[in-house]
């Protein structure tokens, strides 16, 4: 073994995280007597702490442990190694100090000190921060979500402890501005009052004239504008989103997203619900949750009914014109889709993706217009791809090259959409079936069957 290998440790393997449960259930909790099982796991990423190569240099048999109380997240950092490399004039970064830079100042490095703090914090019984926001159950296990803001001192203290999971489990994840009062935090507790996950949400305030309010004329003076009545609305942006590894694989992420979305949607002051820089895994979760929710709202049946009467080139409802070859949809669809996007409070790109996946689900439905529906689905999807990538596509050259690239992109998207849709296709098809209940008097709709 060469010296480089002998004194080098993979940081992802060296760092272990331990969630130490507290004893007891119900309103009060005491320090664990060691009979409960601890959760031990490794991070996915350590490059924000230990550099791009994620290695720790200068130690043999190096082990670093971040222990946290499972309910309060009080942190303790301990280290073990068999030997340390020392050269005159050469020094290595202290891996403990590097980790402590990402943790709150209260982090203990002595286990006796940490146990003393645990006793003090849990002495009067454990109480979750914030107020109860909602509940959900998975496999007969109940989970409670609490909402709070960083203006609350206890919530801020908990957030400073929790935020270490962001760089360790979210690629390119970064800390938020703790002094910004627009941040909300949603914390998920299990029946034992252990934290199983959390999400931070940012509130963007902006003003939109309500339907009942008259808009100021274009030539209005500043004084007139200042007197103009407006209704405050906000955009909820889901930012950090973490389900801790011991509790993953149970569907908790989808349940939390569904709870957040449904509650935000029900708030009349919320104009739009967005997600900040989602990972591929979160994109899949979000797509499937949104598709299930749209199916529950009956949106697939609305799309299907429109496809029976109005082509992709339609300028108004019932316009069945065909034959145009340009990648463009009629003005009616542009307006119809925007009205429904606003109705369902989804961001532009997300609503477009969900609509396109529902279109593809409609292609599996037998109907007199099925052949045209297939062509229309391609037109809708290619249109969005073309608009979003216009500059790149125009650099390809002539029309043949552009159309070829669009077809290639469409086929790739169709394959990815099928992968995403597979677990929730049944929900979407159920949404399509709603047309029979909604249009009991429509004989053509009655004849349509889901294959």
Swiss-Prot record:
UniProt keyword annotations, A-Z: Acyltransferase, Chromatin regulator, Cytoplasm, DNA damage, DNA repair, Nucleus, Transferase
InterPro entries reported in the protein's UniProt record: Acyl_CoA_acyltransferase (IPR016181), Hat1_N (IPR019467), Hat1_N_sf (IPR037113), Hist_AcTrfase_B-typ_cat-su (IPR017380), Hist_AcTrfase_HAT1_C (IPR013523)
Short name of any one Pfam family annotated for the protein: Hat1_N
Region entry Interaction with histone H4 N-terminus, spans: 52-54, 202-204
Active site (catalytic residues): 276
SUBUNIT field: Component of the HAT-B complex composed of at least HAT1 and HAT2. The HAT-B complex binds to histone H4 tail.
Protein task: Catalytic component of the histone acetylase B (HAT-B) complex. Acetylates 'Lys-12' of histone H4 which is required for telomeric silencing. Has intrinsic substrate specificity that modifies lysine in recognition sequence GXGKXG. Involved in DNA double-strand break repair.
Family membership: Belongs to the HAT1 family.
Protein name per its UniProtKB record: Histone acetyltransferase type B catalytic subunit
Species of the source: Yarrowia lipolytica (strain CLIB 122 / E 150)
